[in-house]
Amino acid sequence: MGCGAGGSCTPRPPIRQQPAPETRVVAVVFLGLLLDLLAFTLLLPLLPGLLESHGRAHDPLYGSWQRGVDWFAAAIGMPAEKRYNSVLFGGLIGSVFSLLQFLSAPLTGAVSDCLGRRPGMLLSLAGVATSYAAWAASKSFAAFLASRVIGGISKGNVSLCTAIVADLGSPSARSKGMAVIGVAFSLGFTLGPTLGAFLPSETVPWLALLFAISDLLFIWCFLPETLPPQKRAPSVSLGFRAAVDLLSPLALLRFSAVARGPDPPTGVRLGSLRGLGLVYFLYLFLFSGLEFTLSFLVHQRFQFSRVEQGKMFFFIGLTMATIQGAYARRIRPGREIAAVKRAILLLIPASLFVGWGHTLPILGLGLLLYSWAAAVVVPCLSSVVAGYGSPRQKGTVMGTLRSLGALARAVGPVVAASAYWLAGARVCYTVCAALFLLPFSILRTLSPAAQTLKAE
């Protein structure tokens, strides 16, 4: 595949002439995504200690950022303890990562719509490996921050995984593929934080780099091209112009890049697609806020250590993987929306149990319900959305959805952390519980067309 003047693409023979079996594609996506998520989640239990180590070393950049965080914490009335400010600091770093992912995912999707999924995936994974190499070699906070910036810009591979599954021909294969992606997330967020909590901190970045390089080589060897030349977008420049619509929150919620593209969904289906996108955004906005504050809640209320938090994440991830394997992947096409509505309703008592519970059994019950929702909502919504748009627009559709998710994750943690320390855990989690009624209510208003997986 080559691009001439003006960004037009000249199709070349695909790397693999015969279409690969759908089960093989799903298996390759699962293993590749699992390697990527293992590398990504190794950092989660290390971040507080990593920030503190840069503070103890009197790193100049860290010191200037810490003073800015101190000012912001004082401006919104947060307690003055350093650990609270560090929490906000860590949240800002996480939000920057998600913001960069939000900015880059549409461009990655547009490129893959023209050049194919395989080149886009390899390019993204090369950037991810570079970010872990920078982290492993870093001695200063500036180098660590640069590694997070590179990683955020390169994180379009997750969006491409959903686009690859969306390329599959049958609705049942797409539904199972999205469920398998959910299983990969569950296993990644189960094993990654556990490894990061128990391994020596100096070995973690090198292990992340090993996972990333292994992922790159695995995809290079085994991933077939799933978007044939005749179904690709005519030019990269058209894709980039459409990507501008993916950088505006309002345009994202309206799926403007899809509506203006070739063979867009029309009428009721376009309205349903927009409704599903709004549900996806609201859910991840609220869920990511709870997800971010959870580790600090159990540290303060139950005095969980880094190892105990690793065990908690292991419990959550194992529960998610069990639910996805035994239930979510067996949901029949056309029944996804009903499953999502039930899962969102479960988050209401889950939030109340976690926010108000002062015993481990109550916390465990809340985490069980929380894990059920986490196992069901995103895979099912992704599976439904994958049925919208023409074949050449699958990357744009799924890129839009992932951009909405990245935008939600960019603002959700900061908003939740601010509410947590302004009003306390009980108020924060109670408000979130009530707000989960919003996406549930929107789902109830969607037309029956939103519950089908028939391709346009």
What function would you assign to each model-found segment?
Residues 22, 26, 134-147, 353-367, ...:
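Helix-loop junctions at membrane interfaces in 12-TM secondary transporters
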Residues 101-141:
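Conserved MFS/SLC helix-loop-helix module at the cytosolic interface between two early adjacent transmembrane helices
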Residues 103-116, 322-336, 420-421:
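Helix-to-loop junctions at the C-terminal end of transmembrane segments
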Residues 116, 137-142, 154, 170, ...:
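Helix-breaking motifs and short loop linkers at transmembrane-helix boundaries and internal kinks
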Residues 141, 145-186:
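Cytoplasmic helix-loop-helix junction between adjacent transmembrane helices
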Residues 198-210, 416-440:
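A membrane-interface helix-boundary motif in multi-pass transporters
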Residues 309-333, 343, 347:
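Transmembrane alpha-helices of Major Facilitator/SLC transporters
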Residues 337-381:
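C-terminal transmembrane helical hairpin of 12-TM major facilitator-type secondary transporters
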